[in-house]
Amino acid sequence: EGGLTLIDPVMGDNGEVYSSYTPEMCTRMRELCAIADLITPNTTEAAILLGRDPVSAPQSECEAVEWMQALYEQYGASVVLTGLDYEKGKVGSGCFEGGESTVSLHERIDCYYPGTGDLFAAVMLGELLGGATLRSACVRAGEFVRDTIAYTAEQHTDPNFGVQFEKLLPRLILPEK
């Protein structure tokens, strides 16, 4: 009681349910999301939670807001929808809380690294626990993940090792200039 329950419904990405997931596991994830204060699906996971085709994804900001509102109405939790890419050359996330929505997009960096969703959720949760609003936590997490992707791409490391966020961690604890 008095805490914050964040559920990141890890079930798929890029329009596909993970091969290790069964339909029963997806049903159980829906049940888990129903007890959350905040859910953070990517567009594939949001489609699964809404009973839609996982390949479908919002094609505009208006559709993204509709999806977030539908998730809010179905699960009763605030929503952060990640992996929004309806605008050419951009990617980002949206948040929906208390009837208010915000979408934040930034320039896409043409690289893929596993674990960026986990990093996003962790940074966002840290910001929320530090007193930030959902909107500002979502924006800050998106900027941090974007910066770690850019930094990692510059290092030319094997993408299978994920993003190299450690050197950028001071940005999260030091005051912004």
State what each model feature region is.
Residues 54-64, 128-139:
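Short, charged, surface-exposed loops that flank catalytic or proteolytic processing sites
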Residues 11-13, 45, 83-87, 107-110, ...:
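Glycine-rich beta-alpha junction loops
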Residues 1-5, 74-77:
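A short helix->loop->beta-strand "cap" motif at the edges of active sites that frequently abuts
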Residues 48, 111-134:
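Short, small-residue alpha-helix embedded
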Residues 135-177:
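Charged C-terminal helix
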Residues 19-102:
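Conserved phosphate/ATP/ADP-binding segment of small-molecule kinases
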Residues 101-114:
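Short pre-catalytic strand/loop immediately N-terminal to key active-site residues, enriched for Gly-Thr
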Residues 3-13:
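Membrane helix-loop-helix hairpins that form the core translocation module of multi-pass transporters
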